[in-house]
Amino acid sequence: LDHPGLILADAGDTLEHYFRKIGKPFDQLTFTPDADGVIPVLDREWFEDDIVARTRDFLRATFGVGTLEENVRFIEESLGKDLRKYFMTDFYKDHLQTYKKRPIYWLFQSQKKGFSALIYLHRYTRDTVNVLLNGYLRDFLHKLHSRIEHLEHVQATSESAREKTAARKESDALKKTLRECEEYEREIILPLAQQRIELDLDDGVKVNYLKFGKALATIPGLAAKEED
């Protein structure tokens, strides 16, 4: 919005690179890239800078606040579902199809999709997984613990049978998500963060993507022996 063409296209590009290329001070920018390059994709608004919030920010900056809800409604009607459901279920499949299974956005995702977050390949650095771990995944685990504690308090104190039932169902579901994400953190993300993997974009998406194993969403056929 502030400069024609693709701005962040070199390996390890940061916001500092963006500001230098744009040539404008921060307070004059129409829209800025995500500060840390990690965007949560979750089933509800657990984070203020999740993908739905960032999408709304982009629409607001592009078309104005006065038409924000109208534009969101138009997009959701075109998609046949709300923005959050689209990003949770269809966005990455569409992205893989567009880029022929060589994505420029990578989806970190636990086994049963309890936790998901997108990164942009060209903004990846050796510390990106640490940012995801300490800035998002562990914070998400803390939020899950807090929500479960609240729901258990509701079950213990509420006089409404309906409220107790709803709290129990949500609590049971969140406990499953918590166990899944704790395993993802312990067995997969923490070891990767400690490795501080470096990428060579000249090797191609396939070679680099496979370095992250089960940390990333599976791309059918990517690991097969085929020409890159």
Task: Label each PLM-derived region with a short phrase.
Residues 1-228:
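Terminal accessory regions of large proteins
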